[in-house]
């Protein structure tokens, strides 16, 4: 019973988890944050940057192919959201721009991101469906469990793909090694026969 309660509490904590970071951005530089995200997941975020007169910070969210999913210029504070179409590594970049005639100042950037189950408003769902608080918690846990199962399935799939790739690579390396040894043996045999004919022609051996 205690173990079950611990698992429920752990799932509840995960359900409310989010990713918050704060970093410093030097003048005329950019910093990107990357994360692997499953397909068809909603990603939401909030950002805030310290205001420095004359300095500009832009942000852009994109995938590995360079497709822009969200973008905004001259940011100070705001929100963004985008939907991941495929499983990929997505990045959010903050870009500092300072005029040449101005001495740049380091700015602070804070970012809070949520994805998947974390983006759902279960209070709103509970009110719309007239659910009791316990039923809302159970709904949250159900969605979180489904999300965890999907993560494990994806990890298993990637593990199988990596194992297949390793097996194919090992087979190719073995084939190449055998081919190289055969080539070396063939070359050595040819050299022995050539030298034997050469020495016979010079009458150095019979």
UniProtKB/Swiss-Prot annotation:
Annotated compartments: Membrane
Transmembrane segments: 173-193
GO aspect biological process, one term: maternal specification of dorsal/ventral axis, oocyte, germ-line encoded
GO cellular component terms listed in the entry, alphabetical order: COPII-coated ER to Golgi transport vesicle; endomembrane system; endoplasmic reticulum; endoplasmic reticulum-Golgi intermediate compartment; Golgi apparatus; membrane
Cytoplasmic side: 194-206
Lumenal topological segments: 21-172
Domain GOLD: 30-140
Disulfide bonding pattern of the chain: none
Annotated signal sequence range: 1-20
Main localization category: membrane
Pfam families assigned: EMP24_GP25L
GO molecular function: cargo receptor activity
Protein topology in the membrane: Single-pass type I membrane protein
Record keyword Signal present: yes
Phenotype of gene-disrupted mutants: Mutant embryos exhibit reduced dpp signaling during early embryogenesis. Maternal tkv is not active and is not secreted.
Keywords per UniProt: Developmental protein, Membrane, Signal, Transmembrane, Transmembrane helix
Highest taxon listed in the record's lineage: Eukaryota
Family: Belongs to the EMP24/GP25L family.
Role: Eca and bai are essential, though not redundant, for dorsoventral patterning of the embryo. Specifically required during early embryogenesis for the activity of maternal tkv, while the zygotic tkv is not affected.
Protein's UniProt name: Transmembrane emp24 domain-containing protein bai
Source organism (scientific name): Drosophila melanogaster (Fruit fly)
């Amino acid at each position: 019973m205690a173990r079950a309660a611990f698992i429920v509490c752990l799932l509840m904590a995960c359900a409310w988890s989010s990713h918050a970071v704060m970093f410093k951005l030097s003048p005329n530089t950019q910093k990107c944050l990357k994360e692997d995200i499953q397909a068809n997941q909603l990603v939401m975020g909030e950002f805030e940057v310290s205001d420095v007169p004359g300095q500009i910070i832009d942000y852009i969210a994109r995938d590995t192919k360079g497709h822009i999913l969200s973008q905004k210029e001259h940011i100070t504070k705001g929100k963004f959201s985008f939907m991941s179409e495929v499983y990929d590594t997505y990045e959010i970049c903050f870009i500092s721009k300072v005029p040449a005639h101005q001495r740049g100042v380091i700015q602070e950037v804070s970012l809070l991101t949520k994805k998947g189950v974390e983006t759902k408003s279960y209070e709103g769902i509970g009110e719309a469906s007239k659910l009791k608080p316990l039923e809302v918690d159970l709904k949250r846990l159900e969605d979180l469990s489904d999300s965890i199962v999907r993560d494990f399935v994806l990890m298993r799939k990637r593990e199988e793909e990596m194992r297949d790739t390793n097996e194919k690579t090992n087979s190719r390396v073995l084939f190449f090694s055998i081919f190289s040894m055969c080539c070396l043996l063939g070359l050595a045999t040819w050299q022995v026969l050539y030298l034997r004919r050469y020495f016979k022609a010079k009458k150095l051996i019979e």
